[in-house]
A protein has these predicted regions:
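N-terminal signal peptide c-region/cleavage motif recognized by signal peptidases
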Residues: 3-5
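Conserved, structured core segments of small domains
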Residues: 9-144
Length: 144
């Protein structure tokens, strides 16, 4: 019985392990790292001011671009219509605390103008997630 237990506890080495990639993406021993998952939801601003709404949404998209370029935002995208009024998600990397994340979120015009609100959750996922970003900029035909 003791031998079976020690075999089950043995870690299997990855023959494809690349230390430089693991370091580049700040992976732990399991190829994972901590992120913040932000769920964007409909905010309290019900204004019909189309100019303010358009300006806020343009600022929202510009802010997404800036945060991606700064290496903080890894994933951003809208959600389909749902009963919880969830509008989209963000996944952030390299942000030290929820307080610092909330300061970053406060730079988003749609959040600042209360068209969007948010919920924040710590998330543990693949450290390779940011690796898709260079490809994503090469496959779109129309800029949002």
């Amino acid at each position: 019985m003791c031998c079976l237990h020690s075999i089950a506890q043995e870690k299997i080495a990855n023959p494809n392990f690349d230390d430089s990639l693991a370091q580049k993406y700040e992976a732990d021993d399991y190829g994972m790292r901590s992120y913040f998952l932000v769920i964007l939801k409909t905010g309290k601003n019900k204004s019909q001011n189309q100019e303010l709404l358009a300006k806020s949404m343009r600022g929202h998209l510009d802010n997404i671009k800036r945060l991606v370029e700064n290496g903080k935002l890894v994933v951003a995208g809208p959600l389909g219509t749902n009963q919880k009024n969830y509008r989209g998600i963000f996944i952030f990397q390299g942000v030290e605390s929820q307080e610092k994340l909330e300061a970053i979120l406060a730079t988003d015009q749609a959040i600042k103008n209360n068209f969007l609100a948010y919920e924040v959750y710590p998330w543990y996922g693949s450290a390779a997630l940011p690796a898709y970003l260079p490809v994503s900029d090469k496959i779109w035909k129309k800029k949002p």
